[in-house]
UniProtKB/Swiss-Prot annotation:
Protein name: Large ribosomal subunit protein bL12
Biological role stated in the UniProt entry: Forms part of the ribosomal stalk which helps the ribosome interact with GTP-bound translation factors. Is thus essential for accurate translation.
UniProt family annotation: Belongs to the bacterial ribosomal protein bL12 family.
GO molecular function list: mRNA binding; structural constituent of ribosome
GO biological process terms held by the UniProt record: translation
InterPro entries in the cross-refs: Ribosomal_bL12 (IPR000206), Ribosomal_bL12_C (IPR013823), Ribosomal_bL12_C/ClpS-like (IPR014719), Ribosomal_bL12_oligo (IPR008932), Ribosomal_bL12_oligo_N_sf (IPR036235)
Listed NCBIfam families: L12
Quaternary organization: Homodimer. Part of the ribosomal stalk of the 50S ribosomal subunit. Forms a multimeric L10(L12)X complex, where L10 forms an elongated spine to which 2 to 4 L12 dimers bind in a sequential fashion. Binds GTP-bound translation factors.
Entry keywords, A to Z: Ribonucleoprotein, Ribosomal protein
Pfam families for the chain: Ribosomal_L12, Ribosomal_L12_N
CC per GO annotation: cytosolic large ribosomal subunit
Origin: domain of life: Bacteria
Length: 122
């Protein structure tokens, strides 16, 4: 008995979902294969398709000549006490504020640069 593709397709058209499911299982067992679709693993996105950054870190890279004014600006921006703000300024490069919006990061950067500090936004 020769296999005829048209006859097989005609038989499959008349089969129920349950019968087709059993057929798939039988083929998987007989030929040691899987009917599951392979899942493609996505690599890192290309530069143009990368997500836009929404959270930024403002980092003090250097205090500059007006250290006292920089400490005051850090205190105002973060709500830190004098000792903590001084520790941030003395520990430069150090993050001043993390996970802030772009607007807040730019405003903080401008305020710190206005008093002579060197600042980067990451």
């Amino acid at each position: 008995m020769a296999l005829n593709i048209e006859n097989i397709v005609a038989e499959l058209e008349t089969a129920t979902i349950l019968e087709l499911s059993e057929l798939v299982k039988a083929i998987e067992e007989k030929f040691d294969v899987s009917a599951a679709a392979p899942v493609a693993v996505a690599g890192p996105a290309a530069g143009g398709a990368a997500e836009e950054q929404t959270e930024f870190t403002v980092e003090l890279t250097a205090a500059g000549d007006q250290k006292v004014k920089v400490i005051k600006a850090v205190r105002e921006a973060t709500g830190l006490g004098l000792k903590e703000a001084k520790a941030v300024v003395d520990g430069a490069p150090a993050p001043v504020k993390e996970a802030v919006s772009k607007e807040e990061a730019e405003a903080l950067k401008a305020a710190l640069e206005e008093v002579g500090a060197s600042v980067t936004v990451k």
